[in-house]
Amino acid sequence: MPLAKAFEKKYGVKVELWRALSDKVVQRAVTEAQAKRHAVDVVETNGPELEMLTREKLTSEFYSPYIADLPAFALPPHRQWVSDRMNFFVVGYNTSKVRREELPATYEGFLDPRWKGRLGIEATDAEWMATLIKVWGVERGMNFFRKLSEMKPDVRKGHILLAELVAAGEIHVGLTTYNSNAESMKRRGGPIDWAPVEPVVARPQGIAVMKNAPHPNAALLFADFVLSPEGQELFSSLGRVPASLKVASTLNNFKYTLVDPATVLDESEKWEKIWNELFLKK
């Protein structure tokens, strides 16, 4: 991970990195805490998952001089984690299979029969569905998702995997692609691009220092580095969207609806039940 390598080079502090899907990150942190094994210093993952760790009382109150550079939404009232970057749910498409001008202006355009057998979604994106329904209203929103279910999109777990399958041409269009994943693959020469089809849903990603971090000073130093202009510029260079207002990005110049991680968590049972019925129990 370039961010970890840059930190090691600057401070001479060795970083041991473990990467996994967000649910696995939470599972490991909770399991180890229950076993009184405190091996994790810092967690960087999705906002709702950080909210889960906060409610499990595994994180510590967060302070950094770089919080002043962040938008108001980046720091929850409890200060147990802070947003360091953003993820946007966009339409990723294989440039060998789909021309940009073919893409509809809104998600409802993908209900056209010509897209059947060409669409993919990520298996855990109930919050994307919930946000579209809130934006559109229940009747219009549920009508869309029932019809989308009938299109039988290819459901895959993992946003990186979804983007990889789009780039490989196995899935022509990923409806819930993270623009950061598509952008990084595009910059490496992959046949993939993305478009902010409305309505675009945005979710904060964040970083938390664990309450029982075995190396608390190094953990705080790493968190500061991630939030610093240097760390945020590095995010930007990798095709990520930094949270800092001091670092410009060309990857968020469109209208979007921001989800609140605490609300996502509070309503997760309701929306996941609907999502599972529509897309996972097939």
Which role does the model predict for each range below?
Residues 90-97, 133-135, 204-218, 234:
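A bilobed periplasmic-binding-protein/Venus flytrap-type ligand-binding module shared by bacterial periplasmic
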Residues 249-282:
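Extracellular/periplasmic bilobal clamshell ligand-binding domains
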